[in-house]
């Protein structure tokens, strides 16, 4: 498996900070030649210290740390070097047939040299029972049915309705007849008092 990344026009950090070690290898995959030009960049501790000390604390922000370890962060940032479009790896061309320019640029290439084998097995048993007993809800059990109580009046002008009761709080209760009788009596007493005055 081969991975080719072409990176162009990335900003270059001053070249005296890095120690460059280059190696060129050629490998064969499926009968096709793949040319590789790999650039290994290692950070210089003294140059890193100078770089960090030259910046004011206000200028150091989240972009200056790709890791909690400053030296690792500096090494990660050092990979963002100026590169050439010719650095890409072609499956159909070899190192000799590929044009290259070594002036003013670094060539970067990535190769996957380790294979990762993932084997995962999941044994699970799911049991679904479709037998469902219909149970009465608690609401139905707690509901009690009371007999409806009808109240009648002896007088013809006596009307039992809830329109003038206290917001319908006295609906079909056993004291309804007594309540209306008492209210009618209180009305009569009040009217008699008004007439006497």
Curated annotation (Swiss-Prot):
Pfam families: Rota_NS26
Requisite cofactors: Mg(2+)
Region: Disordered, residue numbers: 16-36, 130-167
Keywords: Glycoprotein, Host cytoplasm, Magnesium, Metal-binding, Nucleotide-binding, Phosphoprotein, RNA-binding
InterPro entries assigned: Rotavirus_A/C_NSP5 (IPR002512)
Binding site for Mg(2+): 92
Listed Basic residues bias regions: 131-146
Localisation per UniProt entry: Host cytoplasm
Post-translational modification: O-glycosylated.
Main location: host cell
One of the GO BP terms on file: viral genome replication
Example of a GO cellular component annotation carried by this entry: host cell cytoplasm
Domain of life: Viruses
Entry function: Plays an essential role in the viral genome replication. Participates, together with NSP2, in the formation of viral factories (viroplasms), which are large inclusions in the host cytoplasm where replication intermediates are assembled and viral RNA replication takes place. Orchestrates the recruitment of viroplasmic proteins such as capsid proteins to these factories. Participates in the selective exclusion of host proteins from stress granules (SG) and P bodies (PB). Also participates in the sequestration of these remodeled organelles in viral factories.
Protein family membership: Belongs to the rotavirus NSP5 family.
Quaternary structure note: Homodimer. Interacts with VP1. Interacts with VP2. Interacts with NSP2; this interaction leads to up-regulation of NSP5 hyperphosphorylation and formation of virus factories. Interacts with NSP6. Participates in the selective exclusion of host proteins from stress granules (SG) and P bodies (PB). Also participates in the sequestration of these remodeled organelles in viral factories.
Name of the molecule in the record: Non-structural protein 5
